Amino acid sequence: MNDMTNIMKKAKEMQQKMQQIQDEMVNLKVTGTAGGGLVSITLNGQNIISEVKIDPSLIKPEESEILEDLIMAAHNEAKEKISTAMAEKTQNITAGLPIPPGFKLPFS
């Protein structure tokens, strides 16, 4: 029974730490770039776009397909940075827990 109490205590501590991390992630801002910096997209920790910058040289009708690709690439880079930041923050919390390799937590 002592083991179960200990597990429940650790789970509650982990839940509190995860809430703290989620609160911190809201304030996180990361920027993904593409085309050597011609396009940049800034996301917050909830994957919401807060800023898009496009170099004026790309705003030409004949360049629209390139611009679309660069916007997607910049967005994907920024999302990957958010995922990496969350993984780094949760790694310390889940250390020592019997979580199988590759298992994704619902909040990460």
UniProtKB/Swiss-Prot annotation:
Major site of localization recorded for this protein? cytoplasm
Which residues, if any, are the signal sequence? none
On whether Cytoplasm is a keyword of this UniProt record, the answer is yes
Subcellular locations according to the entry = Cytoplasm, Nucleoid
Record's keyword terms, sorted: Cytoplasm, DNA-binding
Q: Which GO terms describe its molecular function?
A: DNA binding
Q: Membrane-spanning regions, if any?
A: none
Pfam families assigned to the protein according to its UniProt record, in alphabetical order = YbaB_DNA_bd
The record's InterPro entries line, in alphabetical order, gives:
YbaB-like_sf, YbaB/EbfC
| Protein family membership | Belongs to the YbaB/EbfC family.
Q: Which NCBIfam families match?
A: DNA_YbaB_EbfC (TIGR00103)
Q: How does it assemble?
A: Homodimer.
Q: What is this protein called?
A: Nucleoid-associated protein BARBAKC583_1239
Which source organism does the UniProt entry give? Bartonella bacilliformis (strain ATCC 35685 / KC583 / Herrer 020/F12,63)
Tell me the organism's taxonomic lineage.
Answer: Bacteria, Pseudomonadati, Pseudomonadota, Alphaproteobacteria, Hyphomicrobiales
